[in-house]
């Protein structure tokens, strides 16, 4: 029988829920935290560095954690369990990259580090909160991937980890879906953040990039925050194992840009 209609995507859509967000100290991660908190969720802001905003008094808990270290992740999960006793939303956003070089020149140590944080970290965090989601018979895992998973750049190790993260997402969706746990990924396009700002300081490069995007603008962290909020809410309750591309139409316009005059 259908349940009574309730608007699933409102300002209090996440009231009473607990969200864990990694890579929360700035940029996209911080915007995700702001969106989830604004919709009523208690937010655990996880980063290897100190998070600049929020306190336990306003429903936000800051936790220092190295997502590539299993002991550090388990300690983070213990804090979530002790403070809230549940976890409804996990956003695996923590990631690192490297300077654009070909794989033939990329040191193996750097390759391994990128994989440890971007891929191993997502798995460790998901495994750590899984018992809470399993016991409460539900949860939403959102892995932040990238359009570089489908459109290779010279950030070879980064794009490879993001493609693998999408595969991991689908595996989680299939294995954990029967337990009420959804898993989806988000692939941001060009987003202007403090870390990416150097790419946009050259006016010529900036205008060229804007012209390649049908939306005719560079994305903002809030664009990703809104997409995560959708996947975290009941508005997406039947969405599982999918990748949501948030790029203003950039990837779809590749052939159009090729033949543009």
Residue ranges of model-derived segments:
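Short C-terminal tail/terminal secondary-structure segment
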Residues: 2-10, 97-100, 240-261
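Residue(s) in the substrate-gating loop at a strand-loop-helix junction
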Residues: 146
